[in-house]
């Protein structure tokens, strides 16, 4: 008998065991007293609504195996449609709308979708830019249709009601197909922060393994309340039995979030779990710091939400880019002393891989980072095997034990486990570069494209992206090790090492983004020239950075759209090269 594997099964189980528990809450406007209204689904309502939509979509040709672009912002419709597609065995295609029109078009052409479900704004863009015009046969609009045909959500719901009413035994409900562990569940396009976005093919087994890894690693229990600030991660909340509360924010710009929209629901609903990008934690932490020091004017309501400790919080998760100790330190002031900010390490193709908590970072590893050790990302999670192999930019077809590097030596990080995706959609060239076949299991290992090493305690250290290493005639620089040294200066927000061609050779260039003026003590201003002098002095103390002599200030680093934290070093390299022609 084939076992059904599907992330939507968790939803149905919760609807049976905890039907009245709230599954998801999304923000609406504010009442006259200033309190925000929310729309919500209980687990029973979300399960029934996703069943209804699944039946309606199936009746209109969107069924098992049908690749379906879903461009709906976080909302009740987003959750019900996503779980409907999973129940159907359809293949939702998730593409971040913030990756830019050119990359969006390329991703959608590559995905070759047969169906497109989107809000009115997304449908307008589809028509204007010709997305999927050669492959689409089904279009569903969430909202108003403006003459492009297809169906709206009400029509899908009506079709679902008709399909369900056709079942002769009223005790039965519309039945989803039995999806298997290795069956394709979704295609998730990576951010493209280190190249062209590519579609990671997720199986139902990958999602099931992720849910279990998150549950075990962070001891998440049903009934917890989760504040979801990253849309795709929000889908795990119902699967884990949590209540997902969506804040009012622009999810493509977490660095610009209104801190009150984070603090208010934490206090009002007693949030237990918070997932936020480093940029979001930085924004909220800085606002609290500014209010406490009275360096900015603020509304009393903001102070009332931000200043009281958030005693209900049990854990904070932050991912998408390395989280600086200063960000951890600031945000830790909001939560109980025994609560940690965890920084899970992974990628779209494999998550989670390793994890470390803020206590270990702030008490120990930050001091090693400041001396050039890189960023400690912790120990591998249960069920994941991590290897360090020789650095090469060429494909590796088969796994061999001889590929391993000794403990302590920097190499490429390679992972295997049930949450590791096996291929990129219709990109055999990129699959060949990123995957290694294990002939003993028939499964693929994933090359993370990251560099790192294991220390004597079995902790994994991240040293930067393989494609970002700076190779000069004298030595090879690994970005995370170099930047950790210079980032210790209090007037520096962050740095980025890039390689630029000068006099026919590659030379290291350190780009510096200054700390905001309001964050520095007014009595201790520092000029750009003096800051460069002090950075050169810091660098001269370490063999790793002694030869870095060229530095330049950048007003604001270009960063990825998803987390506003991952630095686009390729853009900085082009910018830096132009400065030194």
Region spans (language model):
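Conserved AMP-binding/adenylate-forming
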Residues: 314, 323, 328-344, 348-452, ...
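Conserved AMP-binding/adenylate-forming core of the ANL superfamily
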Residues: 24-83, 100-105, 202-205
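Conserved AMP-binding/adenylation subdomain of ANL enzymes
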Residues: 91, 208-225, 230-273, 278, ...
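Conserved AMP-binding A3 loop
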Residues: 40-44, 185-212, 243
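Conserved C-terminal "lid"/linker of ANL adenylate-forming enzymes
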Residues: 496-499, 509-510, 536-581
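AMP-binding/adenylate-forming catalytic core of the ANL superfamily
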Residues: 116-121, 264-267, 274, 417, ...
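Structural core segment of the AMP-binding/adenylate-forming
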Residues: 87-162, 267, 537
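Conserved pre-ATP/AMP-binding loop-to-beta segment of ANL
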Residues: 20-22, 169-189, 196, 219-224
């Amino acid at each position: 008998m084939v076992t059904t594997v599907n992330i939507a099964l968790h939803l149905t189980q919760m609807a049976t065991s905890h039907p009245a528990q709230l599954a998801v809450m999304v923000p609406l406007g504010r009442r006259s007293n200033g309190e925000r209204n929310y729309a919500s689904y209980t687990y029973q309502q979300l399960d029934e609504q996703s069943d209804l939509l699944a039946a309606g979509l199936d009746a209109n040709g969107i069924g098992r195996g049908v690749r379906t672009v879903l461009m709906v912002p976080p909302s009740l419709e987003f959750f019900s449609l996503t779980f409907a597609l999973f129940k159907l065995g359809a293949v939702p295609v998730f593409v971040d709308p913030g990756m830019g029109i050119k990359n969006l078009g390329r991703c959608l052409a590559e995905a070759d979708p047969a169906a497109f479900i989107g809000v009115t704004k997304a449908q307008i863009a589809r028509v204007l830019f010709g997305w999927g015009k050669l492959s689409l046969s089904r279009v569903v609009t969430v909202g108003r249709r403006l003459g492009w045909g297809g169906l709206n959500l009400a029509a899908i719901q009506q079709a679902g009601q008709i399909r369900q009413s056709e079942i002769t035994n009223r005790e039965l409900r519309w039945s989803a197909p039995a999806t298997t562990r290795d069956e394709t569940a979704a295609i998730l396009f990576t951010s493209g922060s280190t190249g062209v976005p590519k579609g990671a093919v997720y199986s139902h087994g990958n999602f099931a393994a992720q849910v279990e890894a998150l549950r075990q690693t962070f001891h998440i229990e049903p009934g917890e309340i989760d504040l979801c600030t990253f849309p795709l991660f929000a889908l795990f909340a119902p699967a884990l039995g949590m209540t997902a509360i969506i804040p009012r924010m622009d999810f493509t710009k977490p660095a610009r979030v209104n801190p009150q929209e984070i603090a208010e629901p934490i206090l009002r609903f007693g949030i237990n779990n918070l997932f936020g990008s480093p940029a979001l934690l930085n924004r909220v932490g800085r606002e609290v710091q500014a209010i406490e020091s009275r360096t900015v004017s603020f509304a009393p309501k903001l102070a009332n939400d931000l200043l009281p400790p958030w005693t209900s919080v049990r854990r904070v998760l932050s991912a998408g880019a390395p989280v600086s100790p200063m960000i951890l330190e600031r945000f830790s002031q909001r939560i109980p002393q025994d609560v940690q900010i965890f920084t899970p390490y992974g990628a779209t193709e494999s998550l989670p891989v390793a994890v470390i908590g803020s206590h270990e970072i702030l008490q120990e590893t930050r001091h090693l980072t400041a001396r050039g050790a890189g960023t400690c990302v912790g120990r591998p999670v249960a069920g994941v095997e991590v290897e360090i192999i020789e650095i090469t930019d060429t494909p590796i077809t088969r796994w061999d034990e001889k590929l391993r590097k000794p403990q302590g030596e920097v190499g490429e990080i390679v992972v295997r486990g049930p949450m590791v995706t096996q291929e990129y959609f219709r990109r055999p060239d990129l699959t060949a570069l990123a995957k290694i076949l294990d002939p003993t299991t028939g499964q693929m290992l994933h090359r993370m494209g990251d560099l790192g090493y294991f220390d004597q305690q079995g902790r994994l250290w991240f040293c930067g992206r393989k494609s970002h290493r700076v190779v000069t005639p004298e030595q090879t620089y690994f970005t995370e090790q170099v930047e950790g040294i210079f980032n210790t200066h209090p007037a520096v927000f962050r740095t980025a090492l890039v390689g630029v061609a000068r006099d026919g050779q590659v030379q290291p260039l350190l780009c510096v983004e200054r700390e905001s003026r309001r964050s520095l003590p007014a009595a201790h201003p520092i000029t750009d020239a003096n800051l460069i002098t002090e950075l050169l002095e810091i660098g001269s103390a370490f063999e790793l950075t002694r030869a870095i002599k060229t530095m330049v200030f950048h007003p604001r680093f270009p960063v990825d759209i998803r987390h506003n934290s991952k630095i686009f070093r390729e853009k900085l390299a082009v910018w830096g090269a132009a400065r030194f022609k």
